[in-house]
Amino acid sequence: MAQFYSAKRRVTTRQTITVKVHDLDSFGQGVAHHNGKALFVQGALPDEVAEVSIIEDKRHFSRGVATRIVTASPQRVEPRCPHYSRCGGCQQQHASPTLQQESKAKALSRLLSKPRGETVEVDDIIASRPWGYRRRARLGLSFQPKSQTLHMGFREKSSSELVNISQCPILKPELNALLQPLHAVLSSLQAVRRLGHVELVQADSGSLLVLRHLDALTAEDRQKLERFSHQYRLSLFLAAESDTLEQVSGGMPHYQSHDLTLTFSPRDFIQVNDDVNQQMVARALAWLDLQPEDRVLDLFCGMGNFTLPMGKFAKNVVGVEGVAALVAKAGYNAELNCLNNVAFWQHNLEEDVSRQPWAVEGFNKVLLDPARAGAAGVMAHIIKIAPQRVVYVSCNPTTLARDSEILLTSGYQLERVTMLDMFPHTGHLESMVLFSRK
């Protein structure tokens, strides 16, 4: 009888060590040192002694998981969410909000200080309540054949599997209260095996729900969903395709910002944390010190989150955005709020904005709010415009540091830095920086 050779699977034994953690990175991992290199520890906090299982050992760093806390930090708190140990939505519920904010501010300071070797201090932190803040969420839906049940929730940590959640304490209370009845009605649908995801949004006009379904819904399923929307007083949208949206009940959503009404589509980007967003916009207005003679350019303007409030104080404001649908919505909101001094344009922001017809008169103040990739291609154009003040709103401190260096080597100085705690209990770090021309 022929025998075939097969290589045996390499057996690896995880090393367990005891370390003292001295720092917390912006992602909520404890930082220690072992064998002359950094060790990032999930579940450990500064000043804690922990037993750690090494799960990854690289040349310059290692990663581990705290298996036992020998000496606990006074900043350690009990996670409020019953799903925290598995759900990948939050990473820092075991740390006090104060420690989370201080650690993110330190990380921001380090990244901004590194390029020039000069210490850049974070002036202050804009924050709000750490629970019940999230006004938007997308929940995955997955039917489990073995148990014949529907799972609804977020991805598991380091996995593509869904954690079936019954509550989420970071959601707005109105949305959190919908989770269990929503799961029940979705589980009762004939199409339960062919559902993609559900989006929940809490607008100032009320709650709304978007259901992505992969097959056509029966009349009975549609009736169930419509009855649910009336019972819970929410606007219902159905999405048979990723690029389609059918409104079944309710009105179009809107939110208030600085005495303005901003309407939006369920698929439009809005800031998740309304309280921090309101403070952020107010801070930007204060830093720009808007005067009646000012001409302001708002780059990556979206649907006018900053542009429209600025229009109340400046002579002219121009918002520029690459997505046509957002430009159209922003223009509609300008008309709705009778802001005749605000204009919106669609433009590829990698191209020279200073040469466009709407830029002929120039701008003395600029605000930009780019995506995570930053605005490297835009910075040279801003320098050509030569505004007196620039406010940079960032969702990625690494690209912020890179783009800041371009301004700092072109006659600008850094005046103020604020950390925005837009997403408590997560590793997301947002910030805003004020630059002025020397």
UniProtKB/Swiss-Prot annotation:
rRNA processing keyword on record: yes
Binding site for S-adenosyl-L-methionine: Q271, F300, N305, E321, N348, D369
A molecular-function term among this protein's GO annotations: 4 iron, 4 sulfur cluster binding
Catalytic activity: uridine(1939) in 23S rRNA + S-adenosyl-L-methionine = 5-methyluridine(1939) in 23S rRNA + S-adenosyl-L-homocysteine + H(+)
Binding site for [4Fe-4S] cluster: C81, C87, C90, C168
Protein origin, superkingdom: Bacteria
SUPFAM superfamilies: Nucleic acid-binding proteins, S-adenosyl-L-methionine-dependent methyltransferases
Record has Metal-binding as a keyword: yes
InterPro entries: 23S_rRNA_MeTrfase_RlmD (IPR001566), MeTrfase_TrmA_AS (IPR030390), MeTrfase_TrmA_CS (IPR030391), NA-bd_OB-fold (IPR012340), SAM-dependent_MTases_sf (IPR029063), TRAM_dom (IPR002792), U5_MeTrfase_fam (IPR010280)
Active-site residues (renumbered): C395 (nucleophile)
Coiled coil: none
Record-listed E.C. numbers: 2.1.1.190
PROSITE patterns documented for this protein: SAM_MT_RNA_M5U, TRAM, TRMA_1, TRMA_2
Gene Ontology terms describing biological process: rRNA base methylation
Keywords annotated in UniProt: 4Fe-4S, Iron, Iron-sulfur, Metal-binding, Methyltransferase, rRNA processing, S-adenosyl-L-methionine, Transferase
Domain (TRAM) ranges: 10-68
Function text: Catalyzes the formation of 5-methyl-uridine at position 1939 (m5U1939) in 23S rRNA.
Family: Belongs to the class I-like SAM-binding methyltransferase superfamily. RNA M5U methyltransferase family. RlmD subfamily.
HAMAP family: 23SrRNA_methyltr_RlmD
NCBIfam families the record matches: PRK13168.1, rumA
Record-given protein name: 23S rRNA (uracil(1939)-C(5))-methyltransferase RlmD
Lineage: Bacteria, Pseudomonadati, Pseudomonadota, Gammaproteobacteria, Enterobacterales
